[in-house]
């Protein structure tokens, strides 16, 4: 197969790569600022009016929409922006772009400094925990929730106390509290910014007396001072952070610590994206490359689905069911007991 392209084709392709980089960041910004929701509801918006209503710098707002227009997400018709041919798909995946740019942008920006081995000591990279929590709330809702609720509906019992590891914004615990009146929730997160955000969310939605949070690392759960609360938990959940348990020996130890720390858990719902195998470079779906490359940069091992299957029994758990998620790379919710 010929790979030759004309000079004009190469020039256009490289310009598209450059513009797509800006558009990628603009998707996350347009979501956070409310533009994508307004376009979804109305099909169009007036740029000047939008800037005034949200107290935004109008020339920069024009630039944001120009970036989106350069890749077909919107079209600019004078002072009006209308949805483009790729709007629905981009809007559906908007939280993934926010995770990549607003949450992990600093990691990728410093790629030349992060890659050299001599620099990979101590805290050698930085991400925005608050932005990641903001994005992960919708990532969880759009991609993991159908599989999660299918697992919850099949529990065979009504949970009384739920603990969520890597609880982020606290949204999962809020949803569970809505589903099961009277249930108590406990979030465990390592990031102070995420806990502060979650506490505000929980209080604002009226669950401050049911849901609480503790700062802690799931990998060293035995060092978290919440033994009494942990002993009451009968449903344990963990989403989008199970890969932090790895490599294998560490994962087995973490699973054993969790089994000991939560002695009365009847089900452990563990959901995560896994490392893909065998996908050609030019056919990688959305999110996969950013997720895998980003974690490689951070030195975080990403297991394959088969590798996950090989640790549960040794870690003190039995996998009773797997709920596949086809819309987000190779992702899954494991039902463990």
From Swiss-Prot:
Known catalysed reaction(s)? 3-phenylpyruvate + S-adenosyl-L-methionine = (3S)-2-oxo-3-phenylbutanoate + S-adenosyl-L-homocysteine + H(+)
UniProt KW keywords: Antibiotic biosynthesis, Methyltransferase, S-adenosyl-L-methionine, Transferase
Q: In which pathway does it act?
A: Antibiotic biosynthesis
Question: What is an example of a GO molecular function annotated in this UniProt entry?
Answer: methyltransferase activity
Q: Which domain of life is it from?
A: Bacteria
Which InterPro entries would you find in this protein's record?
Answer: Methyltransf_25 (IPR041698), SAM-dependent_MTases_sf (IPR029063), WH-like_DNA-bd_sf (IPR036388), WH_DNA-bd_sf (IPR036390)
Q: What class of enzyme is it?
A: transferase
**What Enzyme Commission number does this protein have?**
2.1.1.281
GO BP annotations, alphabetical order: antibiotic biosynthetic process; methylation
Q: What does this protein do?
A: S-adenosyl-L-methionine-dependent methyltransferase involved in synthesis of the nonproteinogenic amino acid (2S,3S)-beta-methyl-phenylalanine, a building block of the antibiotic mannopeptimycin.
Question: What family is it from?
Answer: Belongs to the methyltransferase superfamily.
Q: Which PANTHER family match?
A: O-METHYLTRANSFERASE CICE, PUTATIVE (AFU_ORTHOLOGUE AFUA_4G14580)-RELATED
Name of the protein this chain belongs to:
Phenylpyruvate C(3)-methyltransferase
């Amino acid at each position: 197969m010929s790979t030759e392209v004309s000079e004009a084709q190469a020039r256009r392709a490289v310009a598209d790569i450059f513009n797509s980089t800006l558009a990628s960041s603009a998707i996350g910004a347009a979501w956070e600022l409310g533009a994508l929701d307004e376009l979804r509801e109305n099909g169009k918006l007036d740029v000047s009016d939008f800037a005034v209503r949200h107290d935004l710098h109008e020339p920069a707002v024009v630039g944001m929409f120009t970036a989106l227009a350069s890749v077909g997400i919107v079209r600019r018709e004078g002072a009006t922006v209308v949805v483009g041919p790729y709007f629905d798909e981009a809007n559906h995946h908007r939280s993934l772009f926010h995770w990549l740019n607003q949450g992990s942008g600093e990691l990728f920006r410093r790629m030349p400094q992060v890659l050299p081995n001599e620099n990979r000591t101590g805290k050698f990279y930085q991400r925005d925990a608050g932005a990641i929590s903001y994005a992960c709330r919708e990532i969880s809702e759009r991609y993991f929730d159908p599989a999660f609720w299918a697992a919850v509906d099949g529990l065979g019992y009504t949970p009384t106390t739920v603990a969520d590891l890597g609880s982020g914004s606290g949204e999962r615990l809020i949803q569970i509290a809505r589903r099961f009146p009277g249930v108590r929730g406990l979030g465990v997160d390592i990031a102070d910014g995420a806990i502060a955000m979650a506490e505000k969310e929980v209080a604002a939605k009226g669950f401050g007396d049911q849901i609480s949070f503790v700062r802690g690392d799931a990998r060293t759960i035995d060092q978290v001072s919440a033994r009494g609360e942990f002993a009451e938990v009968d449903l344990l959940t963990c989403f989008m952070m199970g890969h932090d348990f790895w490599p294998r020996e560490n994962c087995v130890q973490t699973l054993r610590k969790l089994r000991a720390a939560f002695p009365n858990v009847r089900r452990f719902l563990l959901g995560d994206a896994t490392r893909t195998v065998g996908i050609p470079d030019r056919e990688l779906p959305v999110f996969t490359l950013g997720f895998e490359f980003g974690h490689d940069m951070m030195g975080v091992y990403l297991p394959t689905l088969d590798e996950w299957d090989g640790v549960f029994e040794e870690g003190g758990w039995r996998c009773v069911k797997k709920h596949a998620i086809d819309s987000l790379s190779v992702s899954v919710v494991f039902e463990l007991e």
